[in-house]
UniProtKB/Swiss-Prot annotation:
Protein name: Bifunctional polymyxin resistance protein ArnA
Gene behind the chain: arnA
Pathway(s) this gene product operates in, as recorded in its UniProt entry: Nucleotide-sugar biosynthesis; UDP-4-deoxy-4-formamido-beta-L-arabinose biosynthesis; UDP-4-deoxy-4-formamido-beta-L-arabinose from UDP-alpha-D-glucuronate: step 1/3; Nucleotide-sugar biosynthesis; UDP-4-deoxy-4-formamido-beta-L-arabinose biosynthesis; UDP-4-deoxy-4-formamido-beta-L-arabinose from UDP-alpha-D-glucuronate: step 3/3; Bacterial outer membrane biogenesis; lipopolysaccharide biosynthesis
Site description Transition state stabilizer, residues in chain: N102
SUPFAM superfamilies: FMT C-terminal domain-like, Formyltransferase, NAD(P)-binding Rossmann-fold domains
Length: 660
């Protein structure tokens, strides 16, 4: 049976050997060039392919149409992937009539995504395994063909567990590959409600936070022990690596990070103490804990820190333009909850952020971005991260004031983008789900979906096209001038402080706010073109948590990425949204203050939005990038969001002149 193989690492080598032993004909192997910054302790797929006389390739982008065509010419009957590090596009997967299969280093559906070997140790698991599954468009989500469990011993570290998994993988492939060859396999669908997903790990993720328990820190040490980069901490500005450790049941009132003793080298943790058995100062040699203490100049009572002392002195400065808006005020709240951010904000009002005005790490100026250009340029230069959140983002304005939409959403934001390029500042830019336009894909994918809009005489697309062009400009600045950026695309975020009822009165609000106003005033809920258009509604708390993780940017995983932030499980039509909102309204304790429900009324979009409007039938995000880059999943059910949003707005209504 002819196959094409995508492979890397030890698992790639053993997968190739297993295929050859099972009588498969390998037409070509696709692998990666080795990263010079990565310690290559594993076998070389390229070398193995060369020794076996098999053509081998390492393209930067195997999903490029030219490579898809070359693979098609090989006419593979089946495709295998063994620890290949890039997602393989659906066009390639569809080339093999017998399907495509991937070997994954966990017991799926648990630990989908990157680095499952390390993550299971970080999380203190006692069992993992290997899974062979059918490949589908979503990473690690296809039906399971075979699994083998592997016990994790208390003394296992990453390399010993790696060897166990390799042994299990050989067994699994020896048992399963002949069955695939003869078409004799039983596939079991994964249980999506049990799925967990983890992102890529980088060396920077392995710092030891001493306020955590000793067992948690010990698991971190196990997860990244040699030949991985190692867990680390600091004495002042001196970095040191912990290669092996033990949990010590030492009851101490010492502050976390304090040295309890130097022989053995014992460090107080949030719970218990961690004994550093072996370690390394800077780029030096590995030594036992007591010698490491001497090398680092530690004595009883010394304090360790999780980051260099010089870095700990200054908070990250975040500039939020449009800080009083829906996203801006919720993001400010999330940032100020931590102690390492200084927030600078500009907006034309302050009603939503009044609760922060006396906060010592919040600095606000009331003003217009089109007027305060000098203030903005100065603060772009001063701050570390810039979020230009100012935009007109209500559909009725796209047809009512298209030029104003263009001037604010495009021209003013382009100026800010250029400031970020000039001063080499990181920009986190709010793209929009609107850029996908009338895309027909089931899931809108950041990297593959086409962006399709209507004709020029439909001005409702001016917002979408303005945002899309800014996305492309930012991307080009990143490619050509090194701009550090992330684009995020919110999908119908909802929650308290989304617009206000006064904005809804003039039609300049998002859907749920307009519907709430109809209930408050006793006017009919208008269903535009019947309200059958479907959207995926996302709780503001889920959205802000994802945005916060983009700002945190662990391991720089978000750099140069486009990230959809939405909840594909919360899909509903506007009509269904109205019905859910009505049911919540009827049960609300303040219901008796408001008029009777006036019913639903179907209206044409042209009579509501005006000439030049087009709607979109569905808008469902792929959140593959959010899972990969942020280790993020939305958690909050749509009904909970509706209840809380409704409650917030009803409690803003002046009830003094309402009948009780």
């Amino acid at each position: 049976m002819k196959t094409v193989v995508f492979a890397y690492h030890d698992m790639g080598c053993l997968g190739i050997e297993a295929l050859l032993a099972a009588g498969y004909e390998i037409s070509a192997i696709f692998t990666h060039t080795d990263n010079p910054g990565e310690k290559a302790f594993y076998g070389s797929v390229a070398r193995l392919a060369a020794e076996r006389g098999i053509p081998v390739y390492a393209p930067d982008n195997v999903n490029h149409p030219l490579w898809v065509e070359r693979i098609a010419q090989l006419s593979p009957e089946v495709i295998f992937s063994f620890y290949y590090r890039h997602l393989i596009c659906d066009e390639i997967l569809q080339l093999a009539p017998r399907g495509a299969f991937n070997l994954h280093g966990s017991l799926l559906p648990k630990y989908r995504g990157r680095a499952p070997l390390n993550w299971v140790l970080v999380n203190g698991e006692t069992e993992t395994g290997v899974t062979l599954h059918r490949m589908v468009k979503r990473a690690d989500a296809g039906a399971i063909v075979a699994q083998l469990r592997v016990a994790i011993a208390p003394d296992d570290i990453a390399i010993t567990l790696h060897h166990k998994l390799c042994h299990a993988a050989r067994q699994l492939l020896e048992q399963t590959l002949p069955a695939i060859k003869h078409g004799n396999i039983l596939e079991i669908a994964q249980r999506e409600n049990e799925a967990t997903c983890f992102g890529r790990r980088t060396p920077d993720d392995s710092f030891l936070e001493w306020h955590k328990s000793a067992s948690v820190l010990h698991n971190m040490v196990r997860a990244v022990a040699d030949p991985w980069p190692g867990a680390f901490s600091y004495v002042g500005n001196q970095k040191f690596t912990v290669w092996s450790s033990r949990v010590h049941p030492h009851a101490s009132k010492a502050q976390p990070g304090s040295v309890i003793s130097v022989a053995p080298l014992l460090i107080a943790c949030g719970d218990g103490a961690l004994e550093i058995v072996t370690g390394q100062a800077g780029d030096g040699i590995t030594m036992q804990g007591s010698q490491l203490a001497q090398t680092l100049g530690l004595v009883q009572g010394s304090r360790l820190n999780s980051q260099p002392a010089c870095a700990a002195r200054r908070r990250t400065r975040v500039l939020i333009l449009g800080v009083n808006g829906f996203i801006g005020n919720h993001l400010t709240e999330r940032l100020l909850r931590e102690d390492h951010y200084e927030v600078y904000g500009l907006d034309i009002g302050s009603d939503a952020i009044s609760r922060f005005l006396n906060h010592p790490h919040f600095h606000f100026v009331e003003g217009d971005i089109s007027i305060h250009s000098e203030w903005i340029e100065y603060h772009v230069k001063k701050c570390d991260v810039v979020l230009p959140l100012v935009a007109i983002a209500t559909p009725i304005e796209y047809t009512r004031n298209p030029l104003r939409v263009f001037e604010l959403d495009f021209e003013e934001n382009l100026r800010i983008i250029r400031y970020c390029v000039k001063y080499r500042k990181r920009i986190i830019f709010p793209s929009t789900s609107e850029v996908y336009g009338m895309c027909s894909d089931k899931y809108f994918d950041e990297d593959h979906s086409n962006l399709i809009v209507g004709p020029v005489n439909k001005p409702r697309w001016i917002y979408s096209v303005s945002k899309q062009l800014l996305d492309r400009v930012i991307w080009a600045y990143g490619e050509k001038e090194g701009l550090q950026f992330t684009l995020f695309r919110p999908f119908n975020w909802m929650g308290p402080r989304l617009d206000n009822l006064n904005a809804a009165r003039i039609g300049s609000s998002r859907a749920i706010t307009q519907l709430i106003l109809n209930l408050v005033e006793g006017s009919p809920i208008k269903l535009i073109d019947g309200g059958k258009q479907k959207r995926c509604f996302t709780d503001i708390r889920d959205g802000i948590e994802a945005l916060y993780r983009i700002i945190e940017n662990a391991g720089n995983r978000c750099d140069g990425e486009i990230i959809n932030i939405g909840n594909p499980e919360n899909e509903a039509s506007i009509e269904e949204l109205g019905e859910m909102l009505l049911a919540s309204f009827e049960k609300h304790p303040l219901r008796h203050y408001f008029p009777p429900f006036a019913g639903f009324r179907v209206v044409e979009s042209s009579s509501y939005y005006g000439k030049g409007y087009q709607d979109v039938e569905h808008r469902k995000p792929s959140i593959r990038n959010a899972r990969r880059c942020l280790n993020w999943e939305p958690k909050i059910d749509m009904q909970e969001t509706i209840d809380e949003t409704l409650d917030f707005f009803l409690r803003t209504v002046d009830l003094t002149d309402k009948p009780s």
